[in-house]
Amino acid sequence: MRTYRYFLLLFWVGQPYPTFSNPLSKRTSGFPAKRKALELSANSRNELSRSKRSWMWNQFFLLEEYTGSDYQYVGKLHSDQDRGDGSLKYILSGDGAGDLFIINENTGDIQATKRLDREEKPVYILRAQAVNRRTGRPVEPESEFIIKIHDINDNEPIFTKDVYTATVPEMADVGTFVVQVTATDADDPTYGNSAKVVYSILQGQPYFSVESETGIIKTALLNMDRENREQYQVVIQAKDMGGQMGGLSGTTTVNITLTDVNDNPPRFPQSTYQFKTPESSPPGTPIGRIKASDADVGENAEIEYSITDGEGHEMFDVITDQETQEGIITVKKLLDFEKKKVYTLKVEASNPHVEPRFLYLGPFKDSATVRIVVDDVDEPPVFSKLAYILQIREDARINTTIGSVAAQDPDAARNPVKYSVDRHTDMDRIFNIDSGNGSIFTSKLLDRETLLWHNITVIATEINNPKQSSRVPLYIKVLDVNDNAPEFAEFYETFVCEKAKADQLIQTLRAVDKDDPYSGHQFSFSLAPEAASSSNFTIQDNKDNTAGILTRKNGYNRHEMSTYLLPVVISDNDYPVQSSTGTVTVRVCACDHHGNMQSCHAEALIHPTGLSTGALVAILLCIVILLVTVVLFAALRRQRKKEPLIISKEDIRDNIVSYNDEGGGEEDTQAFDIGTLRNPEAMEDSKSRRDIVPEALFLPRRTPTARDNTDVRDFINQRLKENDTDPTAPPYDSLATYAYEGTGSVADSLSSLESVTTDGDQDYDYLSDWGPRFKKLADMYGGMDSDKDS
């Protein structure tokens, strides 16, 4: 027979609280329908009576915040298989098992080891099982039970905000909603009154009130004025336990600000204002400021100013400064001291935003009187017009009067005025003006085709006060006269085919005219009288300012006459009639059967501008030949500068070179007259010149004496003489040194020559022996003795 096992669940309730138990619904699995009955009892152990049961008692209750020194007893587990011999062991698992909750494995007693807080965790779910201590096998199925934590009033109400901020319009009705405050209590709202909160006001009466259940704050006093008091601080208390004695409470502060409404009209601090302004003030000039005060703020304090009455509302205006809320009096039109000296205005200040419910307080506007005094100033002359427009024919003579301008001093003194033309606007001085009466006249001839409009400026200046002057623009239009003859619109050059037929159109002519007649241009075309009878062409006037050139005969011969020049007379229809003669060039050309030109003397008519292929080839060949010539010339010159390959051992030559001499370069050091080296007389003279006193004494440099070769010497001297006397010989064929004046030169230094006026006994005849290079010097100085004798 199968053994049924049961748990005995016992709940012990500590004093002074009673024992609670809740039935569990019937189990549907794991156990037969018939069960042994369990009976729960308090601290005393009552007899267990067996009875058929259908509910299990598996729920325990435990109070939170236990403050005793011992563990808090929860309940007891017991199995029918427990004979009390210690063979069974009770095991507890689940939420807090072994930590918060412990079980006596021998007796099944459950205890709580710590203080429990329902607000942290209200329910704990655990599982219990009885097992054989020796085998470890369960003797009862695992059973689940619940431990619920019962609430106590251990949490005070807490507001959602520490400080509330709210606003309400001033002058609000009683009961106007301000703000709602909310407090929450962490205690269990389903158990007792621990979480039932009631609101009350501790500070803020009699201005505000609060609803006890909802926490809604409302106004409680009528006509609260922001201008008297703007800020209010209200303290609200929230208390649990329904507000009963012993309940916990919390407070919060509500800062309430009265917002402004337009309940105050603007007011001027004074009833009359007075300002001064000179009559020369231009429109828009500020004269003065007025300000009305308004006790309101924001847009309710905005003020609009306007001129409602007075004799100067057309001359002055008032605008509102949005930053300072001041009214700025400005000039609207030009003032004239001579016409009116004092103006009186009525200025009104009003609120643009008015609430109808406060209209009973009176009109939301105020007015003040403004008196404006106009001061006299010395004003510049005033022209009778803002601008003048005059006309004149382009054929007008010099000093022709065009018109006049007029200006006068607006002041009471009526100072005289003189006129002048601003020459910056009339640089060519085409016009002039009479300084006394303002008459405008021409000073040069006009040409409409050059300039149609002349824009000048006339200046009017007070004679007694030249600083006072004014200007006016003067526009002068030059009227057209028919002074230009019509002419061809372009240069006409055309051709006619040799096989052309009579009356064939070969060119259409057009004309232009610089004049601008009112009725439009109407030109007529005709051949000049001298060509009309003998011409091979005729002119056909199309009556639309165009004409056509027609052939007059059949066939033309370009070999007999290649070009025809047709003089065409163009006339206009204006008065006086103007005409001009233009020439049309007609060339006779050979054409194909379609009339297209093939060849004629005027090649430019058919060939495009540019070069043919043959011309380009010829140019390229010329360039190549030129380059070859230059290269050969350079190579030949370099070859001549090279030293000879074989130098005779008998030919010993030395050069004295000064490297810091800024002479002519390579030519100065290499080109010398070799003939002087082969002239013993010249060499002897260079050794003993008695006619010249040297500035410094230099020892002559001795060179080895070369073997005298008469044939070579005569041959070289002959060739040198031929080249020296040949004026067409190129310069690089003669080797000579003219600028070098160093020691050792066979010609000595020219710096030792003295003036003829200081030493008349000098003999310069030896210059003739130095060759043709010194012939000029020999002519100048060699014959001086004979000149003196004569």
UniProtKB/Swiss-Prot annotation:
Protein name (database record): Cadherin-6
Domain notes: Three calcium ions are usually bound at the interface of each cadherin domain and rigidify the connections, imparting a strong curvature to the full-length ectodomain.
Highest taxon, organism lineage: Eukaryota
Phosphoserine PTM positions: 786, 790
Source organism per UniProt: Mus musculus
PANTHER family xrefs: CADHERIN-23, CADHERIN-6
Function in brief: Cadherins are calcium-dependent cell adhesion proteins. They preferentially interact with themselves in a homophilic manner in connecting cells; cadherins may thus contribute to the sorting of heterogeneous cell types.
Lineage of origin: Eukaryota, Metazoa, Chordata, Craniata, Vertebrata
Single GO term (MF): calcium ion binding
InterPro entries: Cadherin (IPR039808), Cadherin-like_dom (IPR002126), Cadherin-like_sf (IPR015919), Cadherin_CS (IPR020894), Cadherin_Y-type_LIR (IPR000233), Catenin-bd_sf (IPR027397)
Region (Disordered): 260-291
Transmembrane region(s): 616-636
Gene Ontology terms describing biological process: homophilic cell adhesion via plasma membrane adhesion molecules; Notch signaling pathway; synaptic membrane adhesion
Chain ranges on the Cytoplasmic side, renumbered to this chain: 637-790
Compartment(s): Cell membrane
CDD domains with a match to the protein in the record: Cadherin_repeat (cd11304)
